[in-house]
């Protein structure tokens, strides 16, 4: 009998596996689908099905990502797994595959390695809200004390990057044992324990519709006798006719009232996350608004010109720069719908940035942009993308 499609009645959550190369991220992904398939919550996907991940493009960057889906009693999950380290870096920075939480895979035989650190740092910088740890390959370690040492080391590492290292669930097991049905305790049972930890510890993300209203302005029209209409896709929240909203970014913040919402030439009483709408603004002149500003719920987001970010710089092969850049490099930063020029300040001790690097840096824009932590952007030179970034913290 063929399985029916997943019912979308359960709350949905996006997760992904992160960690050092060869610590078992893809094997774990396969093992989760295998164990959950027994309960009817997934379709088993073997290692090689997941490993040959298709390429996709996000913000002008090609990334290989494998997507699998499965469900537990509690939730429906979309799970991303990347074949190579560079794909992880690109994925996390561009937000191509949103992660509401991540499963950090650490080999018990090796302990934390350089990419373990780097992925934890990236998770912190791009705002992954919660991590759960799977200590893999425990069947290769006979010494209980060694396992405890590795666990301690992982907890200390997490704490050093501002994650709650003492509280994060760490599940010991073996993805291979689950795939080969060799040791039920380290295999099957450990996977179920891990999924229970993911269910309980990774918070349910707030739906875009429940967040405060925000719409990036794409176009501005003036309609005789009616006033000024701005169009765009509502990014989050709901706007109701008659509500006061703010126009933020590029210029001084203005207050206005939304006197009409139009979609597909029909008048509506509200627009919500995902809708492409035209919003009629009371008393706003055509020249008072421009592409690149946002409409937002008053007080929910503020304009800023200086921020710290994490960025990935494209290689020459990816269509990026052929040469490194230095402090005071001035490209354009493309936020939502517009480019703003900004100056880059590299961290102390970093002389230059090579194509293919990922780097934390500070940016000073020439005009303010409505931003909060986690906002994604592209770095461009004369219209071509040379990098991608995410706001890690706001300076001013």
Swiss-Prot record:
Sequence segments annotated as region (G4): 136-139
Residues binding GTP: 19-26, 81-85, 136-139
Catalytic activity: GTP + H2O = GDP + phosphate + H(+)
Keyword tags: Cytoplasm, Elongation factor, GTP-binding, Hydrolase, Magnesium, Metal-binding, Nucleotide-binding, Protein biosynthesis
Protein EC: 3.6.5.3
GO molecular function terms attached to this record: GTP binding; GTPase activity; guanosine tetraphosphate binding; translation elongation factor activity
Residues covered by the tr-type G domain: 10-206
InterPro entries: EF-Tu_GTP-bd, EF-Tu_GTPase, EFTu-like_2, EFTU_2, G_TR_CS, P-loop_NTPase, Small_GTP-bd, T_Tr_GTP-bd_dom
Region (G1): 19-26
Region: G3, residue numbers: 81-84
A single cellular component GO annotation: cytosol
Xref: Pfam families: GTP_EFTU, GTP_EFTU_D2, GTP_EFTU_D3
Compartment(s) of residence: Cytoplasm
Ranges for region G2: 60-64
Sequence positions that bind Mg(2+): 26
Chain intervals for the UniProt region annotation (G5): 174-176
Enzyme class, spelled out: hydrolase
Family that this chain belongs to: Belongs to the TRAFAC class translation factor GTPase superfamily. Classic translation factor GTPase family. EF-Tu/EF-1A subfamily.
Assembly notes: Monomer.
Protein name listed in UniProt: Elongation factor Tu 1
Gene name in the database record: tuf1
């Amino acid at each position: 009998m063929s399985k029916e499609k997943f019912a979308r009645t359960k709350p949905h959550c996006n997760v992904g596996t992160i960690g050092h190369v060869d610590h078992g991220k893809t094997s774990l992904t396969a093992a989760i689908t295998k164990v959950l398939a027994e309960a009817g919550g997934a379709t088993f996907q073997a290692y090689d099905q997941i490993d040959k991940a298709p390429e996709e493009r996000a913000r002008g960057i090609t990334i290989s990502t494998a997507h699998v889906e499965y469900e537990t009693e509690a939730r429906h999950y979309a799970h991303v797994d990347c074949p190579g380290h560079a794909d992880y870096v690109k994925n996390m920075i561009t937000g191509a595959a949103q992660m509401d939480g991540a499963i950090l895979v650490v080999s018990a035989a090796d302990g934390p390695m350089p990419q373990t650190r780097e992925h934890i740092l990236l998770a912190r910088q791009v705002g992954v809200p919660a991590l759960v740890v799977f200590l893999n390959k425990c069947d290769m370690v006979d010494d209980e004390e060694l396992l405890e040492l590795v666990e301690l080391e992982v907890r200390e590492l997490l704490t050093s990057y501002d994650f709650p290292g003492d509280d994060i669930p760490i599940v010991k097991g073996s993805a291979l044992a689950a795939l080969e049905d060799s040791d039920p305790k380290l295999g099957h049972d450990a996977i179920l324990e891990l999924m229970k930890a993911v269910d309980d510890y990774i918070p349910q993300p707030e739906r875009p519709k429940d967040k405060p209203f925000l719409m990036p302005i794409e176009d501005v029209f003036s309609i005789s006798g009616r006033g000024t209409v701005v169009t765009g896709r509502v990014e989050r929240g709901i706007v109701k006719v008659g509500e006061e909203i703010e126009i933020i970014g590029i210029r001084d913040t203005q207050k206005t009232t939304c006197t009409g919402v139009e979609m597909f030439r029909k008048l509506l009483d509200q627009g919500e996350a995902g809708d492409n709408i035209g919003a009629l603004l009371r008393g706003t002149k055509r020249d008072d608004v421009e592409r690149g500003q946002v409409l937002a719920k008053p007080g929910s987001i503020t304009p800023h010109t200086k921020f710290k970010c994490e960025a990935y710089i494209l290689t020459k092969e990816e269509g990026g720069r052929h040469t490194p850049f230095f402090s005071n490099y001035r490209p354009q930063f493309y936020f939502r719908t517009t480019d703003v020029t900004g100056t880059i300040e590299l961290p102390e001790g970093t002389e230059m940035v090579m194509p293919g690097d990922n780097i934390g840096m500070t940016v000073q824009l020439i005009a303010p942009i409505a931003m909060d932590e986690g906002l994604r952007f592209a770095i461009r030179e004369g219209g071509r993308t040379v990098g991608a970034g995410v706001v890690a913290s706001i300076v001013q």
